Each structure stands twice: as C-alpha cells, then as structure tokens.
Regions:
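N-terminal active-site segment of His-dependent metallophosphoesterases
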Residues: 1-78
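Active-site neighborhood of divalent metal-dependent phosphoester bond hydrolases
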Residues: 65-130
Length: 130
C-alpha cells in the first residue's frame, strides 16, 4: 500500500449498519461534507441552521486547513451541536496503524507531489494534535 494512494478497508460499512440508525425529528437537515477546517463557513452554516432549527450532520473531512491545534479545536468546538461522521482525514488521525498517510485514495493520474503534500499536511496535523 502506498500512503495517500489507498484508503482503509475499515472505511467500509458493516452489512448490518441500518440496524443501528438514528431518527432525526427535524424539518430541516443540513449535510455538510468537506468542510476542511473552514471556520468561516462553519460559522455561516451554524447561523443558518440556528435560524431554521436545522440538524447538522458533518459527513466527514471536517478538518484539513485547520492544521494548528487551536484552529482544529475551534472547528471542533463550533461543531459541537452537529452529528459528526468520520472521513478519511479524521479516521487517519486516530488510526494507530499509520500506514495510509492521509488516506486520500488518490488515483494514479494525480501527481506524486500532490500525494506527498497531502500526506505531509496530514502528518503535521497529527503531530500538532499529539
């Protein structure tokens, strides 16, 4: 396996995943994917969700450009009312195997430089949080 070119089989859902579902009793649902640590966008999402009494679900990859611990924690604290699902970024932060880098699963036509940079960003984030 090559760091940044593969993702973990652990990302796959268990075949019985629907047996443990959560019912959401809201008229409005925001599904936010790929926030990538953008706290300005998060503030806007929170403001709109508050006005509409919406439930927010963060569909993974909440973090990326919030590489510094304080920025990371700001995003975490400002998303506390939402339901958080793990994306590859979050999963690989807590993965003790540390063999997949960012877990981005870049295809072969993506340059090695991009893959290396993504792995370096992810490793810096992991180091800063450690």
């Amino acid at each position: 396996m090559t760091k940044g070119r593969n993702c973990s089989l652990d990302y796959m859902l268990n075949k019985d995943w629907t047996k443990n579902t959560l019912r959401i009793d809201k008229d409005v649902l925001y599904v936010v994917g790929g926030l990538y640590g953008n706290n300005f966008a998060l503030e806007l999402i929170n403001s709109k969700a508050e006005k509409e009494n919406a439930q927010i679900i963060f569909n993974g990859d909440m973090h990326w450009f919030d590489i510094n611990k304080d920025d990371f924690l700001t995003v975490e604290n400002n998303s506390i009312k939402g339901i958080k699902l793990l994306g590859n970024v979050e999963y690989e932060l807590i993965n003790s195997k540390d063999n997949l880098g960012c877990g981005c699963n870049y295809p072969e036509d993506v340059s090695e430089g991009i893959v290396e940079r993504s792995n370096a960003i992810h490793q810096m984030m992991k180091d800063n949080l450690g």
